[in-house]
Amino acid sequence: TRWAQVRVENDTLVTGYRITSGWARTNYTYFAMSFSKPVREYGARDRRPLDYGGGWRKFDTERNFPEIGGCGIVMHFDFGDDSAPLEVKVALSAVGTRGALANLCAEAGGRTFDQAAADAARKWEEQMSVIEAQGSDEALRMLYTSLYHTMINPSVYMDTDGKYRGVDHEIHQTRDFTNYTVFSVWDTYRALHPLFNLICRDRSRDIVNSMLAHYRQSVHRI
């Protein structure tokens, strides 16, 4: 983690972002997290504190302080009564906090955990149903497990309004295709993408358009 920021907006909403540098250099991930019960107490600590914190040093930022920044932040939340289940909803965005909040409303909204789980199961059933096969339980388990693995990546990389952060770190708007990322084309061009051309051509088209956008935004033209 190169830097992270967390804001406790109110007793049921937390927002923030994290900048990392690894396989994806200077990668921005924003989040919005809501709780079904109000937070009573919370605290934070930076496991990699800065040598000098400026004016922040005069505050006790480890207990009930609504904003913290650092490279090694850990937090805890106390909800008091644990007699009822706690539901936590989280949405991500590479664009910004507003995007994460909009994604949270659009994709989680008023749904319960059970409703979200049922929707996820239904969508996976639709994906797995593109191929009908017969055989032993072991063979079918291997086939559909492998098919499941093909659906994990490439993954959608944009907000619900079509905005996404390009490889040029600018915010782009797409209207005619779904933007994808995590291609690993050197491994997947032999079998995965030909499979997509057979079982999910719409997704294959979106992936190609995403690659073309990547090419146009890249200073290296790759």
Question: Model-flagged regions — what are they?
Answer:
Residues 1-180, 213:
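Beta-sandwich/jelly-roll carbohydrate-recognition scaffolds of carbohydrate-active enzymes
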Residues 154, 200-221:
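Long, well-ordered core segments of solenoidal/helical folds
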Residues 145-158, 181-205:
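Alpha-helical support elements that line or immediately flank enzyme active sites
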